[in-house]
Amino acid sequence: MAEVAVGQASDLVPSEMDHEVIYSHLQGPLEGTIEPATPTEVVSNGAPLQPAPAELANSQGGAHVQPAPAEVVSSQDGLPTLQPLPPASIDLTEEVQPSEENMEVVNPGTSEEPSQGSGANPTAGAARSVSMNNFISGLQRLHNMLELLRPPPADHSVGPIRTRRRMAPILRARAGESQRQDNGRYVPHTPLYAYFQVSRSQPYPLPAAHDSETRNPPSGTDSDSDGSAEDEEVVVQAEEPEANIPEQGVIATDQEATSVTGDDAVPKESPQKPNMLSAMEDEEGETCTICLEQWTNAGDHRISALRCGHLFGFRCISKWLKGQTRKCPQCNKKAKHSDIVVIYARSLRALDTSEQERMKSDLLNEQMLRKQAELESAQCRLQLQVLIDKCTKLNSRVQDLEKFVVRHQNSAAQQCSRSKALCGKCLSSSQSPGKYSSEKTFTISQTGKCRILAYCDGLSCLVASQPSPQASFLPGFGVKMLSTANMKSSQYIPMHNKQIRGLSFSSQSKGLLLSASLDCTIKLTSLETNTVVQTYNTGRPVWSCCWCLDENNYVYAGLASGSILIYDLRNTNTYIQELVPQKARCPLVSLSYLPKAAVAAFPYGGVLAGTLENASFWELKSDFSHKPHVLSLEPGGFVDFQTESSTRHCLVTYRPDKSHNTVRTVLLEMSYKLDDAGEPVCSCLPVQTFLGGPTCKLLTKSAIFQSPENNGNVLVCTGDEASQSTLLWNAGSGLLLQNLKAGEPVLDICPFETNQNSYLATLTEKTVHMYKWE
């Protein structure tokens, strides 16, 4: 198809009369008229409009070939078929001189006369069709040239508007007109102004848009014959407010007008969509969720609410609750007809207060944090004031101490000289101590088997364990009472069936004696009435016993298995606690209680338990629980363990072994240190060692006590089997003070005071020796 220059456009403009004649010619029903098979595509950006000229063929005559880009073939059935037209492009840069071939002025009046006769020549009809097609092509080229001169639109923001129309009745009507029995000629039915239905605001597109926007949908002949309904989709560019788009009265086939700007297609969303969405959102708050109709502020469909707060029309919710489902349609909460509440309001809108609520929540959080910060600030100020006051007091105390040091600086030398004199006096007193002299000897048992001594300060009597003096009449073991007031022996008190291994008097109850025996019992005996007041069956042989000096209602019993049973005198049935050793299970040869004291060196109280192989200190807690502390002692055969409460010392006696040929008695100082958890760990440090004889066959007992001179010295008294005597040592210096002969191995030693005199009693298997301090 040739291009027409702008200067020649005026020659192609038809007159007004020509337009009217052509329009009437195209609109009139003609015999043999064929509907175009391909929809005409109108491109508003200036793309060429293809008018679809055809090659007309008859089944009885020859074909007349016309220079047209489309071909119309009539089959034997009489139904014409229009072949698709190839897309044509126009090159506006090439100048083409108009000629008779591409430009032909047709007189519509002369072309119409032969068409109305019955014997029309097919050749003349084809010539008229070609002339009409050439004329339409000229108009199309003129339209394209005018589009080049049109200025671009000012606003491209308005998108295309797509509308759909049902064209099935029109298509069926035209399909009936197009089917005729006689030969016909091709006459286009599309009105001329359909080619000019283009928006004036569309810019001229790039050449590349022609191929992408031009499409040929398949033929609609079959759809027309079947009579099916088809949708027509028309997309037109939204024009300016002053532009008017004429309505199409009759459209032969599906027509699609597409607005293209450049290479990219304009979106097909309607510019009114946001407004429509907002309108829909507004309607959602004004419609009943049951019938989806707007509620009213009066009548039977007025606004009503349930207890759950959801809104409905009164008629709808009343009918809903009268049915089987008596629940809210939205939240499914149970409801009844009496729950309906009518709301008297003209309109109801939900106010979005989420941001306001969030700001209120943030405000409350900030206020809470501010109050917390103010409280912390007040606490810090209070602590600061307390620290300032404390610092002021400490500064004043430091100043007082400085004054005190200056005031007593001159008297420091005098105090030093006094201390030296006191030390010399103590040294002289240790070099010349007092001595024990023999006071009296008591024969306790003719057969022997005496084991333990104990002194009762309240009754001023000394008791010694012995077998029954009348074994045939009253077998068993008991104690023999010795009066320290007149140094005379008293009566015998029977207690156990087997040998007694431990005796201990209560410091709170007068004359109450605790005894432990190998007959698996411990007993409480009142010396005031000479009767046994309480018996506890331990189930195992008992080797030692002692009282709890911090809680006088509790007693300890050391078993042959190494365990310690704790009894409460208020519970007469059984023991309340058992202390199981952590190491080897050996008989507890000694139990000695160390009371609590306000001493920095070792303030803790507990029981010192010694077996034949090791020793442990069971610390007494505030809840009367006991924490074990295994003492790290030198390995060897242990014989006896004793404690001294005022100096927090303990005394341990060892048998001879391979490393040591003699009996050793070691003085230990109790101490402690804190672990990582802040709990004390008890230990003992050796202070002095006292050596005895080379033999130790019996389980003898030793004693540690304060010096009768009350000079702060500590004395240690041990028995020596080899010399059959009692050895008295100075614990501070380690010197042997005295050797008291007994004639038999000494089994137990008991110091006591009575009538303002200090005595020392030693026990052998048969006798008791009394020594007085002078």
Curated annotation (Swiss-Prot):
Q: Where is this region: Disordered?
A: 32-126, 203-281
Instruction: Quote a single Gene Ontology cellular component term.
Output: cytoplasm
Q: Does the keyword Ion transport apply?
A: no
Zinc-finger (RING-type) residue ranges come to 288-332
Principal subcellular localization:
nucleus
Per-repeat ranges for WD: 493-535, 536-568, 583-628
Q: Where in the cell is it found?
A: Nucleus; Nucleus, PML body; Cytoplasm
Q: Which UniProt keywords apply?
A: Coiled coil, Cytoplasm, DNA damage, DNA repair, Metal-binding, Nucleus, Phosphoprotein, Repeat, Transferase, Ubl conjugation pathway, WD repeat, Zinc, Zinc-finger
**What GO terms are given for molecular function?**
MDM2/MDM4 family protein binding; p53 binding; ubiquitin protein ligase activity; zinc ion binding
Q: Where in the sequence is Phosphoserine found?
A: 59, 75
* Classification via Pfam families: WD40_RFWD3, zf-RING_2
Question: Where in the sequence does UniProt note compositional bias of the Polar residues kind?
Answer: 108-121
Comp. bias intervals (Acidic residues): 92-103, 223-242
Which SUPFAM superfamilies does UniProt cross-reference here? RING/U-box, WD40 repeat-like
Which terms under GO biological process does the entry name?
A: DNA damage response; double-strand break repair via homologous recombination; interstrand cross-link repair; mitotic G1 DNA damage checkpoint signaling; protein ubiquitination; regulation of DNA damage checkpoint; replication fork processing; response to ionizing radiation
* Domain of life from the UniProt record: Eukaryota
Per its record, the protein catalyses:
S-ubiquitinyl-[E2 ubiquitin-conjugating enzyme]-L-cysteine + [acceptor protein]-L-lysine = [E2 ubiquitin-conjugating enzyme]-L-cysteine + N(6)-ubiquitinyl-[acceptor protein]-L-lysine
Q: How is it modified after translation?
A: Phosphorylated at Ser-59 and Ser-75 upon DNA damage by ATM or ATR. ATM phosphorylation occurs at early times upon DNA damage, while ATR is the major kinase at later times. Phosphorylation by ATM and ATR is required to stabilize p53/TP53. Part of the phosphorylation depends upon RPA2 presence.
Q: What happens when the gene is disrupted?
A: Mice are viable and do not show overt phenotypic abnormalities, although there is some evidence for increased embryonic lethality, earlier death, and subfertility, associated with testicular and ovarian atrophy in mutant. Mutant mice embryonic fibroblasts are hypersensitive to DNA cross-linking agents and show increased chromosomal breakage compared to controls.
Q: Key word Cell membrane present in the record? A: no
| Pathways per UniProt | Protein modification; protein ubiquitination
What CDD domains does its record include? mRING-C3HGC3_RFWD3
The role this protein plays is: E3 ubiquitin-protein ligase required for the repair of DNA interstrand cross-links (ICL) in response to DNA damage. Plays a key role in RPA-mediated DNA damage signaling and repair. Acts by mediating ubiquitination of the RPA complex (RPA1, RPA2 and RPA3 subunits) and RAD51 at stalled replication forks, leading to remove them from DNA damage sites and promote homologous recombination. Also mediates the ubiquitination of p53/TP53 in the late response to DNA damage, and acts as a positive regulator of p53/TP53 stability, thereby regulating the G1/S DNA damage checkpoint.
Q: State the domain notes.
A: The coiled coil domain may be involved in RPA2-binding.
Q: How does it assemble?
A: Interacts with MDM2 and p53/TP53. Binds to the RPA complex via direct interaction with RPA2. Interacts with RAD51.
| Protein name (record) | E3 ubiquitin-protein ligase RFWD3
Source organism (scientific name): Mus musculus (Mouse)
